[in-house]
Amino acid sequence: MCIRDRGLITCDSDDVGYTALDEATKKACVSVAYAQSMYAGAANANTALAGEFLGILAGETPAEVESGLLAARRMIEQEASFYSANDDDSIVYFAHCISRTGSYLSAACEIPEGSPLAYLIAPPLESMYALDKALKAAQVRVCAFYGPPSPTNFGGALLTGSQSDCQAACDAFARAVIDVAANPIETLSDGASS
């Protein structure tokens, strides 16, 4: 591919942004030239439009880049999102099942393009507890691990397996984050405190 044109995109969630870039590679003849999280998250941005993430799509023509940007925007606005684990929205998580990866996340995970993926992110403690539950609930494997703290003070992993197993992992992860939010101090059966 002869790269002649580029398009820039930002949003208030880096993980939604990465998912959107991957979607763009499925819908248009583009590649991801750059993708990076901003430190401390969108709520702590130092300018109005800084967002939490910056992505750059590259393509051969303006039309291809525009098509990729539109696909990314649709993903951001209509599909991928963080969810609240409690009533005051102070604990959020991202548990998104991707039925088939594009070139971007496939390369990042070193898996074949078109593989199912469970994209799991939460605050530090919640992410590690919930990741354990997700791995026990489904036949999936870790293909990328984000040990906390990430640049945005979260953690999690990308898991691959069958589409149904990836969905089961997402569901288990979500339930576990919600459980921690509802019971932040709990003694487990082995006596350890979470």
Where are the regions that the model predicts?
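Short amphipathic alpha-helix segments
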Residues: 17-34, 125-139
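Short, surface-exposed ligand-recognition loops at beta-strand->loop->(often short) alpha-helix junctions
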Residues: 10-16, 119-127
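A cross-kingdom feature marking solvent-exposed beta-strand/loop segments within repeated
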Residues: 31-51, 140-149, 153-154
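Hydrophobic, ordered structural segments
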Residues: 52-88
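Conserved small/polar residues in nucleotide/adenosyl-binding loops
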Residues: 1-5
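A common structural junction motif
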Residues: 27-31, 72-81, 138-139, 173-182
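Charge-rich, low-aromatic oligomerization/scaffolding segments with amphipathic character
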Residues: 21, 62-76, 164-177
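Short proline/glycine- and acidic-rich turn/helix-capping motifs at secondary-structure junctions
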Residues: 39-44, 83-99, 149-154, 185-194
